[in-house]
């Protein structure tokens, strides 16, 4: 347990930051899940409206990930990893690979 005033304050600040980071990560994960579900919806029923939904959800998730990296909630490489996951899912949904001729 903290013994002096400054260490008690650091404990309080660390707890506050932990809760803020937790909330930020949670909202980031939610936006990522929305993007993945939008990709699945586009695969089920392709159309212009579904495509714009995929693009909008991807942009929102990218923005949130970039802000998390900027705030220090997420490491730069972890942010890049999550953005790559989203990009692959969106690319696979919008531009599916053509079937091989073999």
From Swiss-Prot:
One of its GO terms (biological process) is translation. Keywords: Ribonucleoprotein, Ribosomal protein, RNA-binding, rRNA-binding. GO terms for cellular component: cytosol; small ribosomal subunit. One of its GO terms (molecular function) is structural constituent of ribosome. SUPFAM superfamilies: Ribosomal protein S20. Belongs to the bacterial ribosomal protein bS20 family. Binds directly to 16S ribosomal RNA. NCBIfam families: S20. This is Small ribosomal subunit protein bS20. The lineage of its organism: Bacteria, Bacillati, Cyanobacteriota, Cyanophyceae, Synechococcales. The gene is rpsT.
